[in-house]
From Swiss-Prot:
Protein name: NADH-ubiquinone oxidoreductase chain 1
Main location: mitochondrion
Enzyme Commission code(s) on record: 7.1.1.2
Membrane topology of this protein: Multi-pass membrane protein
BP GO annotations: aerobic respiration
Gene this protein is translated from: MT-ND1
Amino acid sequence: MFMINIISLIIPILLAVAFLTLVERKVLGYMQLRKGPNIVGPYGLLQPIADAVKLFTKEPLRPLTSSTTMFIMAPILALALALTMWVPLPMPYPLINMNLGVLFMLAMSSLAVYSILWSGWASNSKYALIGALRAVAQTISYEVTLAIILLSVLLMNGSFTLSTLIITQEHLWLIFPAWPLAMMWFISTLAETNRAPFDLTEGESELVSGFNVEYAAGPFAMFFLAEYANIIMMNIFTTLLFFGAFHNPYMPELYVINFTVKTLALTILFLWIRASYPRFRYDQLMHLLWKNFLPLTLALCMWHVTLPITSASIPPQT
């Protein structure tokens, strides 16, 4: 039974990821005053299926000088971790209702760094290694602010369980009292998922395509699926933290519609940002975090710790 539950979670995720690639190409197309994919199937709807068939039927080439085990393990680990992070998400009921769901998701996103590092190192290519080192430095750096912002939100939530965020936001979305945190969170999620304008790992002019440059066919598709699954997952997380959907136990489908619309809006905002902004320079990327975001998030975290003490003489409730 548990396996059926897992499969019923994985298949919709993979379908959502497949069609997100189509939505991205369509959105970018219309923003550049062109049509986007429109040949394969009606309105190009079968394009992701055609892409998947093409990628998974190609021969997966492996460089002679690469480290075989790590080279093969890296994309499998990337996709496995990307799918595992969906387990505690309440939509409206999670697959496993964890007491420390937030910590579990932070731990999984930290482990994803290893798949990037292994792929860059095992490829035995200088471009892949430089891309991987950039990605790792960027991901680890932005996780610092993500963790501090999460701590601030959890102080308002009063629990590490994700489901209680729905109850916390019944009367007021947390984006209103904590809008600076929400803005920094959104920018940090862009950096965490290696999306434009923070896609330094894929600098075409200097690094070809980054840490996955030596990958082809199936393993490349697995990295691709992992990246887009992480994008949707991060937007779901943002919706949970700051745009809590109203949940009526007697009509859970209303929650699902509300939740999906907000997640879709945030995902299209990701694509809109990609179409609008040029890439950051690497030093600007690091300065933004260590010199701007970190002091601000620390100050706001202290504010959220001291507020209940000063206003109600009670310690923070977590």
